């Protein structure tokens, strides 16, 4: 009887581990030149050969909403059999927002977030067996500025580290058009490069959709008060013009910043989670 109880306790401990972050935070740049400290937190689904998603919270490229657009998203994915990795990619941070010190020193800016996401995908692929993941089925999901980040990975990364699919949710897209989210542009480009036309163009994602772009799941709300919904329209038009497999959902209500919350936004916009799960099953990963 005692032996049975001990075994039951061990099983419960393992289950509890998988119901939270199955592994402690990891520094994806540890052991590399410069020893950059960029943390990623795994939330592993049970089993092996799972699909995985790198979750990139939003925050205007200045900061992160790690709760609603990070850990809550990861737990929801984990409950649905998808392993998730919340990436705290480098951002410009609050002091840069307040002081404009990046006119004098570099600070964090492009391509730092993209380098971090590229490194995260490489890191996960190298440990796919350990994490119980199919290395061919690693996607990326991002919110707001994080949506720009994951879509830039779909367009700009080499094929060996490109996500298998991406889900930009109420994303920042353009850096040039009138609907640009200026705060994100300033954070990503840097104070002394925010008016550089060539750089703006290179990071306006509606202009650079490749013919072999991975599948895209795109969501926005027409009452978004933060990122103009025309950003998503620009991306949808570009994906359609290039015949890229994608699903675009435009909700009338929901605003911005609802992430995977069961209470934020509206009942209408919260349907995106069920729609995403249907969509990812249709990909037959």
What are the roles of these predicted feature ranges?
Residues 212, 218-220, 224:
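Short beta-strand/loop motif that positions the catalytic acidic residue
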Residues 24-48, 110-111:
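N-terminal cap/lid segment of alpha/beta-hydrolase-fold proteins
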Residues 65-66, 85-135, 265-269:
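Catalytic nucleophile-loop/oxyanion-hole region of alpha/beta-hydrolase
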